[in-house]
Each structure stands twice: as structure tokens, then as C-alpha cells.
């Protein structure tokens, strides 16, 4: 039962993020924003979709497992940090890479301290979420795949902001 509630929450959270990103995209485009990294974006969507499916499949394959409260607490802390990061970006936050001409990177909230705090959060989420239910294969495989994907994405984003 806890697993179903957790997955429902996770999916709802991700869909909410996509809704916010879609709304922000409309605003960004109205400001003349240019999108970058279109080539790799479908792979990011696929990675995150397969991540959730892998959690479900591995959980079913393992049978019911106990919840690791330490990892659940870490996930809750990540959500707070994510809220801070996303709210600091405001309408500039998106799951895609956009740049409004004449603007620089946002430098408030955690972005004063780190160059890519949201990517740090995503790295931790991909590793920690499966560990809430002791799903080690999903944690390892998707942490590696996500690291590869983020190397591509961060390279593109850094190039965009260097222009």
C-alpha cells in the first residue's frame, strides 16, 4: 500500500513539474526565448519514464519490501531543496533549456552557491528514490544512465550561457 501511495505521489509530482514547465515555456517563448538541446530532450523524457517503470517492475519482481525511513527522509529533504531551487528560478525554470536574449543565468537562492543545484537534486533523487524500497538495480542502472545524460545536458547548457 505504501508503495502505491509513493509511486502515485512521485508520478503526480513529475506531472506537476511538466505542467509548470509547459506554462513557463509559453512565457519564455513570449519573451523571445530560444530553445537549445532539442536533440537530447526526448532521451531525458524516456530516461525518467523508464526510471519510474523500472521502480515498479523491480518492486513487483522483488516482492514487498520494507520502507527505508532514512532514504524516505532524504527524499523529503530533496523535495524541500528542489522547491527552493525551482522557486528561485521562477518563470525561468524549465525541463528544457531556454535562454531569453539579453539575460544571464539566475543568481539567487541556491544558484548563488552552486552552478547547477537542480541537477544535483536530480542526481540524488535518481539514486535515493529506489533505495526507499531497497531497489538496488534501478538505483545503480539509472544513476549511471542519468550521469551520462547530464554530462550531455550540462555541456549544452554551459555552452548556451557562455555565448
Residue ranges and their predicted role:
Residues 4-9, 73-77:
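Membrane-embedded alpha-helical segments that form the functional core of polytopic membrane enzymes
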Residues 12-15, 46, 76, 114:
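Alpha-helical architecture
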Residues 20, 48-63:
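Membrane-helix exit/interface motif
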Residues 21-40, 66-163:
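Cytosolic-biased juxtamembrane loops and peripheral soluble domains of multi-pass membrane proteins
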Residues 9-21:
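N-terminal signal-anchor/start-transfer transmembrane helix
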Residues 38-51:
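Interfacial helix-start motif at the membrane-water boundary
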Amino acid at each position: 500500500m505504501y508503495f502505491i501511495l509513493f509511486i502515485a505521489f512521485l508520478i503526480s509530482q513529475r506531472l506537476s513539474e511538466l505542467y509548470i514547465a509547459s506554462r513557463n515555456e509559453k512565457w519564455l517563448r513570449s519573451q523571445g526565448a530560444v530553445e537549445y538541446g532539442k536533440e537530447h530532450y526526448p532521451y531525458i523524457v524516456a530516461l525518467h519514464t523508464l526510471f519510474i517503470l523500472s521502480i515498479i517492475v523491480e518492486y513487483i519482481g522483488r516482492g514487498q519490501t520494507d520502507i527505508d525511513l532514512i532514504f524516505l527522509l532524504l527524499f523529503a529533504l530533496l523535495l524541500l531543496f528542489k522547491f527552493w531551487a525551482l522557486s528561485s528560478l521562477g518563470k525561468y525554470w524549465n525541463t528544457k533549456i531556454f535562454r531569453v536574449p539579453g539575460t544571464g543565468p539566475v543568481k539567487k537562492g541556491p544558484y548563488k552557491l552552486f552552478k547547477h543545484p537542480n541537477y544535483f537534486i536530480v542526481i540524488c533523487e535518481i539514486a535515493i528514490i529506489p533505495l526507499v524500497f531497497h531497489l538496488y538495480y534501478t538505483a545503480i542502472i539509472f544513476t549511471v544512465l542519468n550521469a551520462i545524460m547530464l554530462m550531455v545536458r550540462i555541456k549544452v547548457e554551459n555552452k548556451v550561457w557562455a555565448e
